[in-house]
Amino acid sequence: MFREINIEDAQEVAEICKVALDYDVDVENVKRQIEKLTNDKKQHIIIGYEDENTRKIIGFVHAQMYESFYSDLGLNILGLAVNPDFQGKGIGKKLMNKLEDYAVDNNISFIRLNSAMKREDAHNFYEHIGYTCDKVQKRFIKVFE
């Protein structure tokens, strides 16, 4: 079942990030980010999916508004993850469908995402639900301490 993510979900979100995305995240940072991002509904769309028995978050999609000089308004998916114990049950597809419904209802022209080259299962999933790979690129980052 869909629901909003809140600070009490930080442990589950951190665990999903670790086991599904291979991101080692600090629970306290996840709490801060949940509080910050869920209060910015004009820029961040965060949809959680809970286990109906335990009421715990087992998946989520997080997207941010994307607009530039060269594109119409779109959504950039920053994260889509489902606890591996629940993968293969249509939860990722339901989350994406919910996000797509949001996009259509809000006159958003496209949804885009980046996916690491090694995540071939994810690539197959996205292609299966109608997404196409339109370019391969490198990511550059500069970290400030």
Roles of regions detected by a PLM:
Residues E4-Q11, E15-L73, L78:
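Acetyl-CoA-dependent GNAT
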Residues I5, L80-V82, S115, Y131:
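Hydrophobic adenine-recognition pocket in adenosine-nucleotide-binding enzymes
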Residues Q43-I46, K135-R139:
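Short hydrophobic/aromatic beta-strand or adjacent loop that forms the aromatic wall/cage
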Residues L73-P84, K138:
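Conserved acetyl-CoA binding element of GNAT-fold acetyltransferases
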Residues V82, G88-D101, N124, H128:
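Conserved acetyl-CoA-binding loop-helix of GNAT-fold acetyltransferases
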Residues M96, A103-S115:
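Conserved GNAT acetyl-CoA-binding A-motif
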Residues L113-A122, I141-F144:
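Conserved beta-strand-loop-alpha-helix junction that forms the acyl-donor binding cleft
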Residues E127-V136:
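Conserved acetyl-CoA-binding loop of GNAT-fold acetyltransferases
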